[in-house]
């Protein structure tokens, strides 16, 4: 996926810049989200990979499936189709979303937990993490039973590992060195 990230970055930045000019950042985020979801569906993915279907047909099908009304977003899909890059739409969406959060001075955080967290626990964690990372955070929670217990938090390239698995790994490293 690192290759997709590298390819998608200039597209996401260009689209975000245009969205800023047109004052359409949030509305285009929704359109990109729909496009990213549709492209990941099996039948649509196979259509995109089909060499006998020309680029304009692929773009038209995607535009119709999502129901895009915005001229610039339609043009964006047509450009991606013409360059055989429709498959990077999910990564373009992810990077555009990161740019939107950054623009709004919000960081994205993922809390990995061995067990489901209650809303109260997530709220308390959010308060602590906002202070620790000195930023407003948009938090999502994912369940990872292999953590055994505790949590692991990722904010950008920073990782805060308070899991049992992390502590056992640290102990193992200490004992073997």
UniProtKB/Swiss-Prot annotation:
It is a peripheral membrane protein. Its main location: membrane. InterPro entries: ATP_synth_OSCP/delta_N_sf, ATPase_OSCP/d_CS, ATPase_OSCP/dsu. One of its GO terms (cellular component) is proton-transporting ATP synthase complex. It is found in: Cell inner membrane. Coiled coil: none annotated. PROSITE patterns: ATPASE_DELTA (PS00389). Keywords: ATP synthesis, Cell inner membrane, Cell membrane, CF(1), Hydrogen ion transport, Ion transport, Membrane, Transport. Signal peptide: none annotated. One of its GO terms (molecular function) is proton-transporting ATP synthase activity, rotational mechanism. It comes from the Bacteria. HAMAP family: ATP_synth_delta_bact (MF_01416). PANTHER family: ATP SYNTHASE DELTA CHAIN (PTHR11910). F-type ATPases have 2 components, F(1) - the catalytic core - and F(0) - the membrane proton channel. F(1) has five subunits: alpha(3), beta(3), gamma(1), delta(1), epsilon(1). F(0) has three main subunits: a(1), b(2) and c(10-14). The alpha and beta chains form an alternating ring which encloses part of the gamma chain. F(1) is attached to F(0) by a central stalk formed by the gamma and epsilon chains, while a peripheral stalk is formed by the delta and b chains. Belongs to the ATPase delta chain family. F(1)F(0) ATP synthase produces ATP from ADP in the presence of a proton or sodium gradient. F-type ATPases consist of two structural domains, F(1) containing the extramembraneous catalytic core and F(0) containing the membrane proton channel, linked together by a central stalk and a peripheral stalk. During catalysis, ATP synthesis in the catalytic domain of F(1) is coupled via a rotary mechanism of the central stalk subunits to proton translocation. This is ATP synthase subunit delta. It comes from Neisseria gonorrhoeae (strain ATCC 700825 / FA 1090).
